[in-house]
A protein has these predicted regions:
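Alpha-helical transmembrane segments of multi-pass membrane proteins predominantly involved
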Residues: 1-267
Length: 267
């Protein structure tokens, strides 16, 4: 088994954001409470640097991590959108962080890790990578939605989001399994090649797989009838986190839907 080659140029935006989040956690250990405001500036610097790398690459297409991620103009557009949402979240969360005595290091790092998950979802050229991106987005959001630990509504929001998110992930994995059983691969280009033959659509596994995949992503979008969790989670989460979830998660799921169905899952 060969280890896939890593295109460092294509992976640079993901690596910069990851290193920024890890750097925030590291500096948070040593900075005094009075100087922790610099953690937000560090996060914004990492976001702006990542945006600069993305803008400089427009017009170029790269495949990263064994062709499981694709970095093209489509994904770069959504990456810039996610990073803009993260930057605005940092700016509007200053008062929330101070008033609610939120741990700044963990807060800013989790926002960046969630943004990284969004970027992976928009760039996924493989259904397994799509699932990993979705989980990288969801797990930080489970924690962020319950960040106000002293409030019962925040605890309730985190628990509901965690349980329903686990169900949605299970549906998504079942859908991926059905599509793999039909096409013999989880790569979108190979699934597209398989489905290009009309006879492939006679296999019921294809429709089960697509249906379950839609259910999993529809939960993240909050599409009817999978929207019942939204009011409780949005009410219990910190205001800045609610804004981040409203804008970011829907854009990420929409990008994943466009990528999957525009590339492979259409007749």
């Amino acid at each position: 088994m060969s280890i896939p080659q890593l295109d460092w140029g294509g992976a640079a935006p993901f690596l910069v954001l990851t290193l920024t989040a890890l750097g925030i956690l590291l500096f948070d250990l040593f900075l005094s409470v009075r100087h922790k405001v610099w953690l937000m500036h560090l996060g914004l610097t990492g976001v702006l640097l990542t945006m600069a790398l993305l803008v400089s690459g427009f017009g170029d297409q790269k495949r990263v991590v064994g062709e499981m991620l694709i970095l093209d103009d489509f994904s770069r557009f959504f990456h810039l959108l996610f990073l803009l949402i993260a930057a605005l979240t940092f700016l509007v969360s200053v008062k929330d962080v101070e008033q609610e005595r939120i741990h700044r290091g963990e807060y800013y790092a989790l926002v960046l890790f969630a943004t990284l998950g969004m970027m992976v979802m928009a760039s996924a050229a493989d259904l397994i990578m799509l699932f990993l991106g979705l989980e990288a987005l969801s797990i930080p959001l489970y924690i962020l939605s319950g960040f106000l630990r002293g409030q019962l509504t925040s605890n309730e929001a985190a628990l509901k989001y965690l349980l329903l998110g686990a169900f949605a992930s299970a549906f998504l994995l079942y859908g991926i399994a059905f599509l793999y059983g039909s096409a013999g691969s989880t790569r979108l280009d190979r699934i597209a090649a398989h489905l290009s033959h009309g006879a492939a659509w006679e296999n019921p596994l294809v429709f089960f797989g697509i249906g379950l995949l839609l259910v999993g992503l529809a939960f993240k979008i909050g599409a009817v009838p999978f929207h019942m969790w939204l009011p409780d989670v949005y009410e219990g989460a910190p205001t800045s986190v609610t804004a981040f979830m409203i804008a970011g998660t829907k854009a990420a799921a929409f990008a994943a839907l466009l990528r999957a169905f525009g590339t492979a899952l259409t007749p």
